[in-house]
Each structure stands twice: as structure tokens, then as C-alpha cells.
């Protein structure tokens, strides 16, 4: 005898007040991830996933759009306060932080967590154009 089909339970979104926005700004792309204090991802967006391709991915405007998309998606969790961790040398660093600020979040701190080598790996050779 077949079991009756179990009704799918509606997933309840938990409410989170404080979160961390991780902005990874490389020379080619910008990735914005918003997590809770424990590091569980609530939302994320990238410049490439926001419709920008090629060299337009690495622009500050593309980083702004990606941060706005991640910020709007995280608002569903009731997020109010953000700490911002910025990593990387890319051109979208400041514009992504400004976009999160314009989404209505109260930004408590901005921290630069760019990894700096203590004479580690050899850097790539210089470009000859």
C-alpha cells in the first residue's frame, strides 16, 4: 500500500538583526555575500550574475548593482545592522559599500581584510602591451 503524499512544509525564514557583508573585489569581478554572525550565508550576488559581461564586470557600477541585489535579498530576513569586510584591490570596493548604505542598512564598521603576503608566492610577471 502506497503512503499518502506528505504535504511539503513551508520553509520559515529566520529573522536576523545583525549581519556581516563580505565584499570580494578582484580586478575582474565583485562578489558580495551577506551572512549572519555565525557565517551562514543569507544572500549573495556577483557583478557577472547581475548581467555584466567581459570588462564591464570589473566596473564600480557593476559592483554597485551586485551589492544592491544582495542587500535587497537580505532584507527579507529582517536585517538592520551590518559590519562590512572588504577584501581585494578591485575597483568596486567603495561603490559596493555605498550601495549597501543606500539600501537602508546601518553600517557599524568597515574592515579591510585583504590578505597581505609576508613575502609568500611570487607575483605574476608584469604585462607588456
From Swiss-Prot:
Alphabetical list of InterPro entries matching this protein: Ribosomal_uS11, Ribosomal_uS11_bac-type, Ribosomal_uS11_CS, Ribosomal_uS11_sf
Domain of life: Bacteria
Single GO MF descriptor: rRNA binding
Swiss-Prot/TrEMBL GO biological process terms: translation
Pfam families in the record: Ribosomal_S11
GO CC, alphabetical: ribonucleoprotein complex; ribosome
Keyword line: Ribonucleoprotein, Ribosomal protein, RNA-binding, rRNA-binding
Function as written in the Swiss-Prot or TrEMBL entry: Located on the platform of the 30S subunit, it bridges several disparate RNA helices of the 16S rRNA. Forms part of the Shine-Dalgarno cleft in the 70S ribosome.
Subunit structure comment from the entry: Part of the 30S ribosomal subunit. Interacts with proteins S7 and S18. Binds to IF-3.
PANTHER family: 40S RIBOSOMAL PROTEIN S14/30S RIBOSOMAL PROTEIN S11
Family assignment from sequence similarity: Belongs to the universal ribosomal protein uS11 family.
Name this polypeptide is given: Small ribosomal subunit protein uS11
Native source organism of the sequence: Pseudomonas putida (strain ATCC 47054 / DSM 6125 / CFBP 8728 / NCIMB 11950 / KT2440)
Gene: rpsK
Amino acid at each position: 500500500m502506497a503512503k499518502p503524499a506528505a504535504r511539503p512544509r513551508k520553509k520559515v525564514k529566520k529573522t536576523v538583526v545583525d549581519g556581516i557583508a563580505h565584499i570580494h573585489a578582484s580586478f575582474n569581478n565583485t562578489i558580495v555575500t551577506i551572512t549572519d554572525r555565525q557565517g551562514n550565508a543569507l544572500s549573495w550576488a556577483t557583478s557577472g550574475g547581475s548581467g555584466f559581461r567581459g570588462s564591464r564586470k570589473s566596473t564600480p557600477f557593476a559592483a554597485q548593482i551586485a551589492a544592491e541585489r544582495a542587500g535587497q535579498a537580505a532584507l527579507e530576513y529582517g536585517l538592520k545592522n551590518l559590519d562590512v569586510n572588504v577584501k581585494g584591490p578591485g575597483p568596486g570596493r567603495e561603490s559596493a559599500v555605498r550601495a549597501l548604505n543606500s539600501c537602508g542598512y546601518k553600517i557599524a564598521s568597515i574592515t579591510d581584510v585583504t590578505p597581505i603576503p609576508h613575502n609568500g608566492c611570487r607575483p605574476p610577471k608584469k604585462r607588456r602591451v
